[in-house]
A protein has these predicted regions:
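Short loop/turn segments that connect beta-strands within beta-propeller blades
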Residues: 67-71, 109-113, 148-152, 193-197, ...
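A short helix->beta-strand "capping" segment at the edge of beta-propeller domains
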Residues: 20-38, 68-72
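Blade-loop segments of beta-propeller domains
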Residues: 71-107, 113-125
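Conserved beta-strand positions in repeat-built beta-propeller and related beta-rich domains
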Residues: 53-57, 96-102, 137-141, 181-185, ...
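Beta-strand-rich domains and repeat architectures in extracellular enzymes and scaffolds
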Residues: 30-62, 77-89, 237-239
Length: 252
């Protein structure tokens, strides 16, 4: 299981005080929904108004079509225990699902969810999203990889806060022309300019899940989904009991 010591993670809440051009945001919870506590959330997204989720861990990895109102899987398929599933996204007619350390990615039919093919993937798979024109992926470093539908590399982009690379980019979502990424093991989301990689905003997500709801299995924030149909944004975490519809409000 992928675990990274928090001491090696950049504290963007501290860094955000150094650059006045980087906007700081807090969360406003609009609504909350149940979330399956067995879901070690790796990827979360909407396609045609429907929520989908990929979940990880060897022997427990799944992909599921999720009923937002109940948190239950309307449809689910599992993977061989050798695979640790990571991020997922629909681009064109394909559903793409990454694996962490197996150096493969799976492609399914986006409409039927039927398996189509397995592709070689040249790096660790962490997360993947799309801007509607290309795939955008992270390997947990400070680099974002822009890929075509066959995973051919189109460009690399280094994400930076001021002049410092921002590592551990995890769970990407393309929202209104920007790339949102939560920074693994932190309660922070960075908002990235996809043209130059500059961090333009930091979202403070501390306290989103109340401590009273924590169990021994509750893990970190990981799950950002934007529904283009209505403009709503949702957050959750690994093995969290709740999914939250949120808005961000600039800090005064």
């Amino acid at each position: 299981m992928r675990r990274i010591l928090t001491v090696v993670v950049m504290s963007l809440l501290l860094l955000s005080c150094a650059d006045a051009s980087v906007k700081e945001y807090k969360l406003q919870v609009v609504a909350e929904y149940p979330h399956d506590t067995e879901s070690y959330t790796q990827g979360l997204f909407f396609h045609d108004g429907q929520m989908y989720e990929s979940t990880g861990l060897h022997g427990k990895s799944t992909f599921r079509k999720v009923d937002l109102a109940t948190g239950k899987a309307l449809k689910k398929f599992t993977f061989d225990k050798k695979y640790f599933v990571e991020g997922s996204v629909v681009f064109g007619d394909n559903l793409y699902i990454l694996t962490w350390d197996s150096k493969v990615a799976f492609v399914y039919d986006a409409g039927t969810l039927e398996y189509k093919s397995t592709w070689s993937y040249p790096r660790e798979g962490w997360v993947i999203t799309t801007d509607g024109k290309q795939l955008i992926a992270s390997d947990g470093s400070a680099t974002l990889f822009f890929l075509d539908e066959n995973f051919a590399l189109k460009k690399r982009l280094i994400v930076k806060y001021e002049d410092r690379p921002v590592r551990w980019l995890n769970e990407l979502e393309y929202i209104d022309g920007k790339i949102w990424a939560n920074v693994y093991t932190t309660d922070e989301i960075v908002i990235i300019n996809p043209k130059d990689g500059r961090v333009e905003g930091v979202v403070d997500c501390r306290g989103l899940l109340p401590k009273s709801l924590y169990t021994k299995d509750t893990d970190v924030l990981n799950g950002i989904a934007f529904n283009p149909s209505d403009g709503k944004i949702y957050l959750t975490g690994k093995n969290w009991p709740k999914m939250y519809e949120i808005k961000i409000v600039e800090k005064k």
